[in-house]
């Protein structure tokens, strides 16, 4: 099961997985796994020396390519609640604001993995409608499919 909604500065994606939250969260707590969950068209590359496990206040530097333009991005882990949720916030990158909450909710089928993003862009509604929304749909659809492959 997969649900995706993107509307003017907010994105919501949920994926039902057959594994429980502790196993799924463990995968997410290794920043090297970001590469696995990121579509190749973004040309994602981690630039930071990473710890074994992500923790509160960690900063992760990486580079992506948006429309063939290389962009440096730095995220900071601002919430870390093991097996339940964490939040990464862009502190350097292409958005005016990017706050990405990852939730893991156990249920009778395993766990529901939820991505909630609140974002603001520099050039407003038209750029969001023409470019950002479509790219986020591609990114989160890829991510949901990859999570299903790994945990179903």
Regions from the language model: what does each represent?
Residues 87-138:
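Beta-strand/loop substructures that line and gate deep hydrophobic ligand-binding cavities in soluble
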Residues 45-92, 145-150:
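Glycine-rich portal/gate segments that line the openings of hydrophobic small-molecule binding cavities
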Residues 17-19, 66-68, 79, 94, ...:
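Beta-strand elements of well-folded, non-transmembrane domains
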Residues 138-146:
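A non-catalytic, amphipathic alpha-helix used as a structural packing/dimerization or gating element
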Residues 13-15, 73-79, 90, 99-106:
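Hydrophobic/aromatic beta-strand elements that line small-molecule binding cavities or substrate pockets
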Residues 1-51, 55:
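Hydrophobic ligand-binding cavity/cleft-lining segments
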Residues 24-28, 34, 60-62, 77, ...:
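Hydrophobic pocket/interface hotspot
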Residues 21-22, 53, 79-85, 103-112:
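A short, structured loop/turn motif at beta-sheet edges
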């Amino acid at each position: 099961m997969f649900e995706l909604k993107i509307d003017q500065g907010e994105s919501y994606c949920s994926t039902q997985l057959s594994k429980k939250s502790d196993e799924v969260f463990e995968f997410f707590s290794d920043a090297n796994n970001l590469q696995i969950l990121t579509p190749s068209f973004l040309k994602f590359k981690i630039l930071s020396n990473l710890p074994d496990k992500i923790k509160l206040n960690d900063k992760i530097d990486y580079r992506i390519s948006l429309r063939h333009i290389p962009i440096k991005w730095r995220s900071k882990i601002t919430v870390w609640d093991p097996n339940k949720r964490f939040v990464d916030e862009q502190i350097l990158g292409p958005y005016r604001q990017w706050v990405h909450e990852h939730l893991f909710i156990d249920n009778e089928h395993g766990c529901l993995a939820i991505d909630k993003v609140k974002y603001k862009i520099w050039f407003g509604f038209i750029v969001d409608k023409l470019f950002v929304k479509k790219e986020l749909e591609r990114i989160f659809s890829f991510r949901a499919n990859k999570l299903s492959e790994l945990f179903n």
